[in-house]
């Protein structure tokens, strides 16, 4: 028998964050994995980041987590998304070398004396008086601890579906977790059956890239990590490509829907609304002449590409027809066929905001087992579960992030308060405070918590505070520098008392234009210069946003009887339209309690009603 401070089941994105954050405080962790090849595995898209998700990765970094550093060290391409839009929507996305990513984490585990990686299946959890005592592995070894974090991902009672074939396996043909799934049900935890999928992998050298649209990275130095920054030169970055479906492909799919596991009743689990299979896209969006497909490298060491956007549960022969009808893929060779995977998840309303279960003390669930989708959503849950175990070990107050502090706070509050019916994906539209939850300010929002918990080093904290002081001094100087006393700055205005701060609010000016006229000009690096621009330009919008949010109070008195079809309401999500048209709530308060409806939807419904009232 071995005793540990905490046990973690699963070494995917959630499990790794949980283990490393505890090890950072020198707590001994046993990290269980079915196979060492599954450490940091990316069974689907080989990327980190994206809208909202890339900001989560930076939030993880600000709290002392690992994902940002791992992604920076194993990137194949880095891209700033939505750069033509406002900074509130900016997010980083890195194409990752999936083999190097796993290897990077394995090396970090080997170097860490506080993490024991144990490649054994856990088949049962031991409890006494509704408290965790430890776990048994399949060879009947017992590992003792008062804390257990379960991060089994999509492995819990998993089944692979290709056409009408059903295989009791986990992702990437690894074994699933069936004994543990059985015990969780026997403990009367409410479970839900979910489904996700992955597209085919194609041999790189069988594609005619001249027929595809090039998608390069961003030619500027960006990193997920705030301190351990590592950049990949633009000329060394891998190129991605865009391809498209066409009417012939749509015809093939429609003619073979009876062979799809999803459409022939073989799958009962609900699939992800925001990452539908190609069958779903063709059926649900039958007015579309084509759908985008993303041609992305998986690793420098692999001969395959990932064909994003073509996830499917159709049989192999139909997949062959589909792929060969994509322009540029006429001679393509499929090395690994697409499949759907069905698995058990926990209904997360059974959790506290700390991710500890209400039923059993010391038992935490984190990651896709809580009904989420995506590596970033999983990683942040693992981090928060690990931090809250740490808080209990040190008799601290739990760390529960608010919705206006982090996307992590939005995610966890949504999970524990709203019924999950399909895999939950973070979206910018879910965050009512999204102008405050930006890519550029994760450190300003969260670094203090990481430092207080001892998860951020003193040197990094000192570096941050020095930069913050320079940032604040720059803002003060911009506020006090007027056209009258900065005559060298050419600006067409008769008001000589106009400050550079006021001018910088305009979209056609940036901090670079002001910098030559400031005494503080040499103390900020590029990252903090961008912060100055964004802070000033978004100040007014953030105040307006807060006013609108405050106006949604007392929403139970706002009646919705005048709305016959929510398709008429602009700027609400498709999910909101679908669900509100089904439920037909009587008041805005009732609408707020419908799963999948967020504050942004409520604000836009209220604005619609106000505008409608003005017109009558």
UniProtKB/Swiss-Prot annotation:
<dbReference type="GO" id="GO:0030488">
    <property type="term" value="P:tRNA methylation"/>
</dbReference>
<dbReference type="InterPro" id="IPR049312">
    <property type="entry name" value="GIDA_C_N"/>
</dbReference>
<dbReference type="InterPro" id="IPR040131">
    <property type="entry name" value="MnmG_N"/>
</dbReference>
<keyword id="KW-0520">NAD</keyword>
<comment type="subunit">
    <text>Homodimer. Heterotetramer of two MnmE and two MnmG subunits.</text>
</comment>
<keyword id="KW-0963">Cytoplasm</keyword>
<dbReference type="InterPro" id="IPR036188">
    <property type="entry name" value="FAD/NAD-bd_sf"/>
</dbReference>
<comment type="similarity">
    <text>Belongs to the MnmG family.</text>
</comment>
<feature type="binding site">
    <location>
        <position position="122"/>
    </location>
    <ligand>
        <name>FAD</name>
    </ligand>
</feature>
<feature type="binding site">
    <location>
        <begin position="271"/>
        <end position="285"/>
    </location>
    <ligand>
        <name>NAD(+)</name>
    </ligand>
</feature>
<dbReference type="InterPro" id="IPR047001">
    <property type="entry name" value="MnmG_C_subdom"/>
</dbReference>
<dbReference type="Pfam" id="PF13932">
    <property type="entry name" value="SAM_GIDA_C"/>
</dbReference>
<dbReference type="Pfam" id="PF21680">
    <property type="entry name" value="GIDA_C_1st"/>
</dbReference>
<comment type="function">
    <text>NAD-binding protein involved in the addition of a carboxymethylaminomethyl (cmnm) group at the wobble position (U34) of certain tRNAs, forming tRNA-cmnm(5)s(2)U34.</text>
</comment>
<feature type="binding site">
    <location>
        <begin position="10"/>
        <end position="15"/>
    </location>
    <ligand>
        <name>FAD</name>
    </ligand>
</feature>
<dbReference type="InterPro" id="IPR044920">
    <property type="entry name" value="MnmG_C_subdom_sf"/>
</dbReference>
<keyword id="KW-0819">tRNA processing</keyword>
<feature type="binding site">
    <location>
        <position position="368"/>
    </location>
    <ligand>
        <name>FAD</name>
    </ligand>
</feature>
<dbReference type="InterPro" id="IPR002218">
    <property type="entry name" value="MnmG-rel"/>
</dbReference>
<dbReference type="Pfam" id="PF01134">
    <property type="entry name" value="GIDA"/>
</dbReference>
<dbReference type="GO" id="GO:0050660">
    <property type="term" value="F:flavin adenine dinucleotide binding"/>
</dbReference>
<dbReference type="InterPro" id="IPR004416">
    <property type="entry name" value="MnmG"/>
</dbReference>
<keyword id="KW-0274">FAD</keyword>
<keyword id="KW-0285">Flavoprotein</keyword>
<dbReference type="GO" id="GO:0005829">
    <property type="term" value="C:cytosol"/>
</dbReference>
<dbReference type="GO" id="GO:0002098">
    <property type="term" value="P:tRNA wobble uridine modification"/>
</dbReference>
<feature type="binding site">
    <location>
        <position position="177"/>
    </location>
    <ligand>
        <name>FAD</name>
    </ligand>
</feature>
<protein>
    <recommendedName>
        <fullName>tRNA uridine 5-carboxymethylaminomethyl modification enzyme MnmG</fullName>
    </recommendedName>
</protein>
<dbReference type="InterPro" id="IPR020595">
    <property type="entry name" value="MnmG-rel_CS"/>
</dbReference>
<dbReference type="InterPro" id="IPR026904">
    <property type="entry name" value="MnmG_C"/>
</dbReference>
């Amino acid at each position: 028998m071995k005793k540990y401070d905490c046990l973690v089941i699963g070494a995917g994105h959630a499990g790794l964050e949980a283990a490393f954050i505890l090890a950072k405080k020198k707590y001994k962790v046993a990290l269980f994995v079915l196979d060492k090849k599954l450490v940091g595995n990316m069974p689907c898209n080989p990327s980190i980041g994206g809208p909202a998700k890339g900001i989560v990765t930076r939030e993880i970094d600000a709290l002392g987590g690992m994902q940002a550093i791992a992604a920076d060290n194993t990137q194949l391409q880095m891209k700033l998304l939505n750069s033509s839009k406002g900074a509130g929507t900016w997010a980083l996305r890195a194409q990752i070398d999936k083999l190097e990513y796993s290897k990077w984490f394995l090396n970090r585990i080997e170097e860490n004396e506080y993490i024991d990686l144990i490649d054994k299946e856990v088949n049962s959890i031991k409890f006494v008086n509704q408290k965790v005592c430890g776990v048994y592995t399949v060879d009947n070894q017992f590992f003792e601890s008062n804390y257990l974090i379960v991060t089994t991902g999509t492995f819990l009672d998993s089944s692979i579906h290709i056409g009408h074939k059903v295989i009791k396996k986990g992702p990437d043909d690894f074994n699933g977790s069936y004994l543990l799934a059985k015990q969780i049900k026997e403990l009367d935890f409410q479970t839900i059956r979910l489904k996700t999928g992955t597209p085919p992998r194609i041999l790189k050298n069988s594609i005619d890239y001249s027929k595809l649209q090039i998608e390069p990275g961003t030619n500027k130095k960006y990193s997920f990590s705030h301190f351990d920054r590592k950049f990949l030169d633009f000329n060394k970055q891998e190129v991605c490509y865009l391809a498209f479906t066409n009417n012939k492909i749509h015809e093939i799919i429609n003619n073979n829907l009876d062979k799809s596991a999803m459409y022939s009743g073989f799958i009962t689990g609900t699939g992800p609304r925001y990452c539908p299979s190609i069958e779903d896209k063709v059926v649900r969006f039958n007015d579309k002449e084509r759908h985008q497909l993303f041609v992305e490298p998986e690793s420098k060491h692999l001969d395959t590409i990932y064909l994003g956007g073509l996830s499917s549960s159709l049989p192999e022969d139909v997949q062959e027809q589909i792929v060969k009808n994509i322009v540029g893929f006429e001679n393509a060779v499929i090395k690994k066929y697409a499949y759907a995977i069905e698995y058990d998840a926990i209904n997360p309303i059974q959790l506290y905001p700390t991710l500890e279960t209400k039923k059993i003390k010391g038992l935490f669930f984190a990651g896709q087992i809580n009904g989420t989708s995506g590596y970033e959503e999983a990683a942040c849950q693992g981090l928060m579960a690990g931090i809250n175990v740490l808080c209990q070990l040190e008799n601290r107050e739990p760390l529960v992030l608010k919705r206006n502090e982090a996307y992590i706070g939005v995610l966890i509050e949504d999970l524990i308060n709203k019924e999950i019916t399909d895999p939950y994906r973070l979206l910018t539209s879910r965050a009512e405070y999204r102008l405050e939850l930006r890519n550029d300010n994760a450190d300003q929002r969260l670094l203090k918590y990481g430092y207080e918990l001892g998860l951020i080093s003193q040197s990094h904290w000192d570096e941050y505070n020095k930069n913050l002081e320079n940032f604040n001094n720059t803002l003060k100087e911009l506020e006090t520098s007027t056209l009258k006393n900065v005559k060298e700055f050419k600006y067409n205005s008769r008001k000589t008392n106009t400050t550079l701060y006021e001018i910088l609010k305009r979209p056609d000016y940036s901090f670079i234009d002001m910098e030559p006229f400031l005494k503080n000009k040499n103390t900020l690096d590029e990252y903090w210069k961008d912060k100055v621009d964004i802070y000033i330009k978004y100040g007014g919008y953030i105040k307006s946003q807060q006013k609108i949010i405050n106006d949604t109070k007392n929403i139970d008195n706002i009646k919705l009887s005048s709305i016959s079809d929510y398709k008429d309401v602009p700027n609400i999500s498709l999910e909101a339209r679908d669900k509100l048209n089904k439920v037909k709530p009587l008041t805005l308060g009732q609408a707020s309690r419908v799963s999948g409806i967020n504050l942004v939807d409520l604000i836009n419904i209220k604005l619609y009603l106000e505008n409608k009232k003005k017109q009558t």
